[in-house]
Amino acid sequence: MTTDFTPWPEALAAQYRQLGYWQDKTLLDYLQQSAERTPNALALVGDNQQWRYQAMLERIEQLAAGFTELGLGCGDNVVLQLGNVAEFYLCFFALLRQGIRPILALPAHRLAEIRYFCQHSQAKAYLIDGAQRPFDYQALAQELLACCPTLQTVIVRGQTRVTDPKFIELASCYSASSCQANADPNQIAFFQLSGGTTGTPKLIPRTHNDYAYSVTASVEICRFDQHTRYLCVLPAAHNFPLSSPGALGVFWAGGCVVLSQDASPQHAFKLIEQHKITVTALVPPLALLWMDHAEKSTYDLSSLHFVQVGGAKFSEAAARRLPKALGCQLQQVFGMAEGLVNYTRLDDSAELIATTQGRPISAHDQLLVVDEQGQPVASGEEGYLLTQGPYTIRGYYRADQHNQRAFNAQGFYITGDKVKLSSEGYVIVTGRAKDQINRGGEKIAAEEVENQLLHHPAVHDAALIAISDEYLGERSCAVIVLKPEQSVNTIQLKRFLHQAGLADYKIPDQIQFIDQLPKTSVGKIDKNALRRRFDTLGLALMS
């Protein structure tokens, strides 16, 4: 029997409650507390909408009643794929209120990923944006209905263009009926998505208790309060802008979230000046772009207190440059959707902020740095990071075999990150052990792309490697061996991957053709040799 959810051991759960980490409240309870304190305070701005706390809460309750009337109930799974719009949070909280579990798909996900989420979770509904651009999600939903038998309803923000009665408009879901909240703080609240190293992203089950602790502790560390004005330019469904402290942290503190569907500095700087933004979260490529643009920008960015950078390693040189370029403090963030989050603290020295990725949220976060044999390394030595704690999951959803590889016998999560741990407990990220490309914060599993390439009739063998990129940190390069007397070009291969339903960010940035892939002494593809051959920028930086 497949395990849906791996709970924390009872002794640990009891300890976390005794310490006050787990409050046995739902995520909606924290929003309700803010609505009670400051009902008329501005909570959310975006897409020509403004929501004050009490009005937002009432709208969430109306949606919750409407979702219940659709036949969705506690324990049902729903794929939620909305961008940076107010309805993302309204739907998120409404589903949580009823114990309905949203899978937080990203706007960039396409057929291959969404089909897997629906089939693996037996999702009953798919919630999407009705706009045709930049992507037609309604057309995707029609494909899903043909291959996902549990999918009963497609809920569309905006207008439906499909006559199928399974398509309904979100606007019709608001109900004046009352319904009893049905969420359990100890059970799965929603699903985040893993970066993945073995194909399609795994589902990460987060409970109300563990996630709420992560957010509330982050609020304290980052000193969010009712005066916080947070600009969300990264995809709202990402763990980083959702909970570190992210939008949820702003709601908990009684501040205001300003949404932007455009992350460009030209647009974002205008919003910073207009709304007196105090904090935002960026991935390294975006931070570099903003820094470059700030040098010639005339917008007033003086309201910024600090900018968070995470999702991928931020170079020391860039970290030292940011405070002067943007006129505010840098906070480095190193975290994962599976749990563990590290922050540099706001009162840390400039040297610590520039040279480390922070230290953990909790005194009860356990970090182990081990060698290839699983033995602890000396302080300051490089090794592989393992972790467990009050907000780090104990297993992926319905993934027993993968869990045996991803967690050790003591329940520690094997992160796949190579790090050093300082004597003060600060983490310095040095690399990755997993076969994964971190493209500007978007994680790409090499195996997933390789498997799709191998389905092409002209491809004999394929390897996907990471190569250095000045802005993205890493980009992807597919190295292809063709079958005898077969031919295919780069454009045709990329089109093939698009047609297979891969997300755009997974399409290789570069494709190289060679006669034979190099092998190690045990017959595995030697990706280090491929990187040495094709990563010209990385070699230049090392020389």
From Swiss-Prot:
* An MF annotation (GO) of this entry: 2,3-dihydroxybenzoate--[aryl-carrier protein] ligase
EC id: 6.2.1.71
Q: Which UniProt keywords apply?
A: Cell inner membrane, Cell membrane, Ligase, Membrane, Transmembrane, Transmembrane helix
| InterPro entries assigned | AMP-bd_C (IPR025110), AMP-bd_C_sf (IPR045851), AMP-binding_CS (IPR020845), AMP-dep_synth/lig_dom (IPR000873), ATP-dep_AMP-bd_enzyme (IPR050237), DHB_AMP_lig (IPR011963)
Q: Which SUPFAM superfamilies match?
A: Acetyl-CoA synthetase-like
Q: What Gene3D superfamilies does the database record attribute to this sequence?
A: 3.30.300.30, 3.40.50.980, Luciferase, Domain 3
Q: Where in the cell is it found?
A: Cell inner membrane
**Where is the chain membrane-spanning?**
240-259
Which enzyme class?
ligase
Q: What reaction is this protein's catalytic activity?
A: 2,3-dihydroxybenzoate + holo-[ACP] + ATP = 2,3-dihydroxybenzoyl-[ACP] + AMP + diphosphate
- Give the UniProt entry's GO cellular component terms: plasma membrane
From its record, what is one biological process in GO terms?
siderophore biosynthetic process
Pathway given in the UniProt record:
Siderophore biosynthesis; vibriobactin biosynthesis
Q: How does it sit in the membrane?
A: Single-pass membrane protein
Q: Is the keyword Secreted assigned to this protein? A: no
**Family (UniProt):** Belongs to the ATP-dependent AMP-binding enzyme family.
NCBIfam families from the xrefs? Answer: DHB_AMP_lig (TIGR02275)
Q: What does this protein do?
A: Activation of the carboxylate group of 2,3-dihydroxy-benzoate (DHB), via ATP-dependent PPi exchange reactions, to the acyladenylate, preparing that molecule for the final stages of vibriobactin synthesis.
Name the record gives this protein = Vibriobactin-specific 2,3-dihydroxybenzoate-AMP ligase
In the UniProt record, the gene name given for this protein reads vibE
